[in-house]
Amino acid sequence: MRVREICGLVSLVAMAAIGLPVRARQAANAPLPNIPELMQKVEDHQKQVEKLRENYTFTAAQTTEDMDANGHVTKTETEEDDDFFVNGHLIERSVKKNGKPLAGHDEDKETERVTKLVEKAEKTPPGQPLEGQTISISRLLDIMDVRNPRRETYRGRPTIVFDFIGRRNAKTHGLAEDASKKLQGTVWIDEAGLQVAHLEVSFNDKFRVGGGLLATVDKGTNFRFDQAPVEEGLWLPTGGEATVDGRLLLVKSLRQHISERDYDFKVFRVETQQSRDAKVDSAAKP
């Protein structure tokens, strides 16, 4: 499971002043915005920059480590993807596994998968998931309690920071909403960019899928997610990390540490035929 897929459930919920420049210290004294209004602005701004994201492709390198009950690594797998956006949807094309480029049948199978996904993305309105479920910011804020809003500087930029925790008594529908009730964490919102700069989330209780028959996510499972500005008005993911502890189908224990690094951002142009072939013609960003 990709780090961004895990963070997708909660990514929209998503130092000190000593020694900071004068501008940052002044910002720290400014009145805090209303958090629901701020998050609505974040959501609206994201819709505005979706087309701009489609001008970029980048590389995502992921390492997955399986661990035993004592925390010792028993297996390590790596994967490298070429990622790009179509109609507001992220498309991930696998190009390497365990350091070896995909070839032959594996490459053909991946091309077929990505081509179908691109076609589906072209027909799916932005904001609607290609797979699984989604949850709006306004709905998420109905499920979460927001606490301790404050100002901090994150990576040299002023941010609005707040903690959140799911309300156990909230009425929910669907997997994403049900999971949100058992999450807690902290989100850093870049004030100028209106983007989630950093997100840290953990499960504060067991979360059972299908009553535990399909899967159980244990308390303490956690993940983080980072974004950074690529150009004026555009932010893209730079990486993330997750520690997952749980069980599949009642019998198989799942203990994994997953890390992802996103890099090599490039400008590209997708032609009609290229979209159908799931290939991109890219040029390095100056």
Q: Where are the regions a protein language model picked out?
A:
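Bacterial N-terminal signal peptides
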Residues: 8-17
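Structured extracytoplasmic
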Residues: 25-184, 191-197, 202-222, 226-239, ...
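Juxtamembrane cytosolic interface motif at the C-terminal end of transmembrane helices
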Residues: 19-21
